[in-house]
Amino acid sequence: MHITVCVSQQKPEPWQQGLQAALPEATVSVWQPGAPAADFAVVWAPPQTFFDEQAGLKAAFNTGAGVDALLKLRIAPTTRIVRLDDAGMSVQMAEFACHAVIRHFRELDGYEADVRAGRWSYRKPRARADYPVGVMGLGVLGERVARALTVFEFPVHGWSRSPKAIDGVRCHAGEAQFDAFLSSCRVL
């Protein structure tokens, strides 16, 4: 079994070393143009050239959850595309989104500017009801973000291509509900 690693914007060596340690019977290489064909690939933002040269791949494992960029490339129909379903990213994304929403809601940038300027300015507390938050995409990551935001009692709206039902989240689906979703959100 030959595995090749083609990860743009990342160092490929940790992937190569980790895979080689986990699969000592496999040949694991870092892809270079003109390299021998592989059976499997670990990829992130590979160039079209990669798939042109690796037409016999059985599967390409994307190192992130989103595969939209891969689907724009010409890939042999026999090559399976595998994406991460979560791999711990949903918790990180929920933390990041909650931090960003609360930072904006509480006007923390303004308070920090006041601290740097050596002044204190009163800011009227905001009502959460006036800050509906929208989450685009309600897959594994989006659902986790939406659920996390409900804990802070923000009105949460979610949009996805297909209908979903999430406790505490007003779900919108499809192109027909997209404008209504956008107009219901103050923060997206």
Predicted regions located by residue number:
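Short, structured coil segments at secondary-structure junctions
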Residues: 23-24, 55-56, 75-77, 152, ...
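Phosphate-coordination loops involved in phosphoryl transfer and adenosine-cofactor binding
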Residues: 2, 78, 129-132
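A short, aliphatic-rich alpha-helical micro-motif
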Residues: 34-36, 51-54, 179-184
